[in-house]
Amino acid sequence: MSRIGKKPVELPTGVTASVSGQTIEVKGPKATRSFTATDDVTLKVEDNVITIEPRGKSKRARQQWGMSRTMVGNLVTGVTNGFKKELEIQGVGYRAQMQGNTLKLNLGLSHEVNYEVPAGVTVTCPKVTEIVIEGTDEQLVGQVAANIRDWRKPEPYKGKGIRYKGEFIFRKEGKKK
């Protein structure tokens, strides 16, 4: 059984947290983010340390304890450092570029793919074959990266498509005569 909930979340300098009911609000140099925990846990802020305690001994309370601790830890990381996902594009003629708030992708389809970037996330293209997604919400950054990758997942024969930076694609051998 994981005991991640027992670990308190320490607040770095320049970050403040306040609890009102089941909602915790964390303010940092990059943003202000909040999280509402379930009634199975209690949240406390004392001496720049956030502690999460389960309200009972039930299985659900223990599950929410670990999950809430991880979510609060991600809030603190997001408002201090932020989160970043990098995508690589491989394939002849495959390219990406930002135009305003729209990511334009040429992926070998008969049309250009236009992806509207949601608020709270910044997308940049340092090269035409690289996409960098940054933001303070880990879930939103990962979801945007997954949505972009879904347009052309890497195929196993030539490796063409959009992949996460450093992702290993299992390559298959073609048909033999």
From Swiss-Prot:
One of its GO terms (molecular function) is rRNA binding. One of its GO terms (cellular component) is cytosolic large ribosomal subunit. Part of the 50S ribosomal subunit. NCBIfam families: L6_bact. It comes from Dinoroseobacter shibae (strain DSM 16493 / NCIMB 14021 / DFL 12). PROSITE patterns: RIBOSOMAL_L6_1. This is Large ribosomal subunit protein uL6. Gene3D superfamilies: Ribosomal protein L6, alpha-beta domain (3.90.930.12). GO terms for biological process: cytoplasmic translation. InterPro entries: Ribosomal_uL6-like, Ribosomal_uL6-like_a/b-dom_sf, Ribosomal_uL6_a/b-dom, Ribosomal_uL6_bac-type, Ribosomal_uL6_CS. Belongs to the universal ribosomal protein uL6 family. This protein binds to the 23S rRNA, and is important in its secondary structure. It is located near the subunit interface in the base of the L7/L12 stalk, and near the tRNA binding site of the peptidyltransferase center. Keywords: Ribonucleoprotein, Ribosomal protein, RNA-binding, rRNA-binding.
